[in-house]
């Protein structure tokens, strides 16, 4: 089987192995592929593996040998899955491979906002502590999470894991989700506006849909406490970026930690890149080495199951 990986660079910059896929056939790896090069590079492929490249009906119709599309991701909005099904092409995704690492990044962003570790360390290494006359010296006040309220928007696997981390630190947990289920003791359901009003930290873990696009708008930001933080490891377009930048720069909320933006990479004039008390990381929450190794392993398992006539994780 000839396997083409169109954009393997983000999944594997060289620190993990493609061996699970190489065991299934001949593999050609491209770090990235421009849209106009997809057909040329995949023309002889029976299986195409991709992360962010867009595969339309038109492209699939130009790839007569294509039988399988393996997504190096959980989301599958980059592939026309309806067309794939009609053309007899199986599309498989990888659920749950990065739950823990995304939750870890959400808390890394939150803890940096609370403890200012990098800023305080830089000040200390710059001689600030040397000049002090006290044993304990800090250039930034610390924010304690114990007893505070964590609002979780979206209660899938990642949202549940973030809630557990918050509960372990003694936080009260408010949950908003379209689907209700039994909650652990000390968790409470909340309507969306009530959650924004009462939470000390709002953490977003919902998918991007027509319903959630722009969900965090000026009106909801105005509901938040001036001491509250917003964390987004979901999708950039869930947040109105201009409204969030205004809320940060005016002191309407205390800070934001973002791993996702509307445009990735961002435009140079993205207002959040210069916003006050805003930490931005380049969509890396999913990308721990362990998570990326799991991702490649599961894509290979998906392809092997397809070849054996028992496909798994099918989304087409």
Language-model features: locations:
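An anion/phosphate-binding loop that grips the pyrophosphate of nucleotide cofactors and donors
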Residues: 45, 63, 199
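Rossmann-like adenosine-cofactor binding region
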Residues: 54-60, 172-174, 178-271
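Rossmann-like dinucleotide-binding domain for NAD(H)/NADP(H)
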Residues: 87, 91-92, 227-316
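Glycine-rich Rossmann-fold phosphate-binding loop(s) that bind the pyrophosphate
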Residues: 155-156
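Short beta->alpha connector loops at strand-helix junctions that form conserved
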Residues: 31, 51, 72-73, 89-100, ...
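Phosphate-binding beta-alpha-beta segment of Rossmann-like dinucleotide-binding domains, i.e.
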Residues: 87, 95-149, 315
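N-terminal glycine-/charge-rich "phosphate-binding" loop or analogous flexible N-terminal tail
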Residues: 1-45, 174, 307
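N-terminal Rossmann-fold NAD(P) dinucleotide-binding loop
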Residues: 159-160
């Amino acid at each position: 089987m000839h396997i083409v990986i169109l954009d393997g660079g983000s999944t594997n910059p060289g620190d993990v192995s493609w061996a699970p896929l190489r065991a299934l056939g001949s593999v050609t790896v491209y770090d990235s592929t421009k849209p106009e090069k997809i057909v040329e590079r995949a023309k002889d492929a029976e299986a195409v593996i991709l992360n962010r490249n867009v595969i339309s009906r038109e492209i699939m119709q130009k790839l007569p040998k294509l039988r399988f599309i393996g997504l190096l991701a959980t989301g599958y909005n980059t592939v026309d899955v309806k067309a794939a099904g009609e053309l007899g092409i199986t599309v498989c995704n990888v659920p749950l491979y990065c739950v823990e690492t995304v939750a870890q990044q959400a808390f890394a962003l939150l803890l940096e906002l609370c403890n200012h570790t990098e800023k305080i360390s830089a000040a200390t290494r710059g001689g600030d502590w040397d000049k002090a006359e006290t044993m304990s010296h800090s250039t930034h006040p610390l924010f304690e999470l114990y007893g505070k309220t964590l609002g979780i928007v979206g209660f899938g696997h990642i949202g549940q894991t973030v809630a557990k981390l918050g509960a372990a630190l003694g936080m009260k947990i408010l949950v908003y989700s379209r689907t209700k289920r039994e909650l652990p003791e000390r968790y409470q359901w909340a309507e969306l506006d009530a959650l924004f009003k009462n939470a000390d930290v709002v953490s977003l873990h919902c998918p991007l849909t027509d319903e959630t696009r722009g969900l965090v708008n000026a009106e909801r930001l105005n509901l938040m406490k001036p001491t509250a933080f917003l964390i987004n490891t979901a999708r950039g377009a869930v947040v109105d970026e201009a409204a969030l930048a205004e809320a940060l720069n005016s002191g309407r909320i205390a800070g934001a930690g973002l791993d996702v933006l509307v445009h990735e990479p961002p435009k140079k004039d993205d207002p959040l890149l210069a916003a006050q008390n805003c930490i931005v990381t380049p969509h890396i929450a999913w990308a721990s080495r362990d998570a990326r190794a799991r991702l490649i392993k599961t894509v290979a398992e998906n392809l092997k199951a397809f070849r054996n006539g028992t496909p798994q994780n099918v989304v087409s």
